[in-house]
């Protein structure tokens, strides 16, 4: 029999004669209230312990345990709001489609401040270091938390977008931590696990959806491309290259004039004398149309088109079903009585109470 990919056995693998008639019980958990635990957070070690337990609760370290990823946004909400209203408005309207930070009620926003206070004691008041700490905690649980593509994309959309405006160096560090955990250099671009495939797809799709994020700073774009080449994420690097080529096509403006104009617009000093670029119609036209047109961009591609053709993925061998065996299988499609498990007596012996089975007619 071939090896299976996970612990679930395929259809008709079991040959059960009995089953338990008791219904499944689902235990409901109460809401997380940080205020109740604030009295315990008296020093840095206890704050770190509370944050570790919270990450274990949101992203369990046990295989196939249900995760509570949405609770992680309660810790992210006060961290992201430190950037200020103007930066959040720019990120939400211009750079990213949704930040979704105002989805909590009033008491939840007040309660989130307690967890943020613990995070400040452990990491510090710097917003970039706080987001880096959260990214590191999530990457430690990549193998077991089983989040999936959409949850990783939501996390990158909230954390990485705001870092490009406030902490560009921390953005590169976060990207390096993610690539080191999901796509190590020693694997040479081969994706062997489902979690790595989900993380790399989410990161690729995030960059492809928002290529203009990297165009705010050419140094960040160069570092990102070097990281992607180093970790063999060549389809994503190819899209960044296409975005730069598209920006320069149509208007033949030298790179020196582009960089000079960007540098002049950053510095507001009337005493400095710069060469006049206003009379150059090409540079003025490029400045007016240098933003990317998201509706007509060629960068909006599906992940499968690139990772299926460019990224090597090791296929797992699953159980092969060879058809219905009439001699060794039982019919479960007709009406039957309730079957019960074997009864275990106090002396250790087992007694079969009642079993009904129906063999299929071979004719």
UniProtKB/Swiss-Prot annotation:
Pfam families assigned to the protein according to its UniProt record, in alphabetical order: DUF5509 (PF17625)
Protein name per Swiss-Prot or TrEMBL: 43 kDa protein
Species per Swiss-Prot/TrEMBL record: Autographa californica nuclear polyhedrosis virus (AcMNPV)
Gene that encodes the chain: P43
């Amino acid at each position: 029999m071939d090896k299976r990919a996970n612990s679930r056995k395929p259809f008709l693998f079991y040959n059960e004669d009995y089953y338990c008639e008791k219904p499944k019980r689902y235990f409901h958990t109460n809401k997380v209230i940080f205020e109740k635990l604030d009295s315990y957070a008296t020093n840095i070690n206890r704050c770190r312990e509370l944050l570790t337990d919270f990450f274990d609760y949101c992203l369990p370290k046990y295989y196939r345990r249900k995760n509570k990823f949405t609770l992680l946004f309660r810790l992210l909400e006060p961290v992201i709001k430190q950037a200020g209203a103007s930066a959040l408005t720019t990120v939400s309207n211009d750079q990213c489609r949704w930040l979704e930070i105002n989805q909590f009620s009033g008491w939840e926003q007040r309660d989130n401040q307690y967890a943020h206070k613990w995070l400040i004691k452990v990491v510090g008041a710097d917003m970039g270091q706080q987001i880096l700490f959260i990214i590191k905690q999530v990457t430690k649980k990549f193998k077991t938390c089983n989040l999936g593509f959409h949850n990783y994309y939501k996390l990158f959309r909230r954390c990485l977008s705001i870092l490009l405006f406030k902490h560009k160096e921390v953005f590169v560090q976060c990207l390096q931590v993610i690539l080191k955990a999901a796509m190590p250099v020693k694997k040479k671009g081969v994706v062997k696990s489902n979690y790595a495939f989900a993380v790399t797809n989410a990161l690729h799709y995030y960059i492809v959806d928002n290529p203009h994020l990297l165009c705010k700073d050419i140094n960040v774009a160069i570092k990102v491309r070097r990281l992607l080449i180093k970790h063999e994420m060549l389809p994503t690097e190819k899209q960044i290259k296409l975005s730069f080529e598209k920006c320069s096509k149509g208007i033949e403006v030298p790179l020196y004039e582009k960089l000079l104009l960007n540098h002049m617009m950053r510095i507001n000093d009337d005493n400095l004398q710069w060469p006049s670029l206003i009379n150059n119609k090409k540079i003025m036209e490029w400045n007016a149309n240098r933003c990317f047109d998201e509706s007509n961009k060629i960068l909006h591609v599906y992940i499968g088109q690139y990772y299926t053709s460019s990224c090597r993925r090791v296929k797992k061998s699953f159980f092969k079903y060879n058809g219905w065996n009439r001699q060794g299988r039982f019919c479960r499609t007709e009406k039957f009585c309730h079957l019960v498990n074997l009864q275990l007596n106090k002396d250790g012996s087992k007694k079969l109470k009642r079993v009904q089975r129906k063999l299929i007619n071979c004719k």
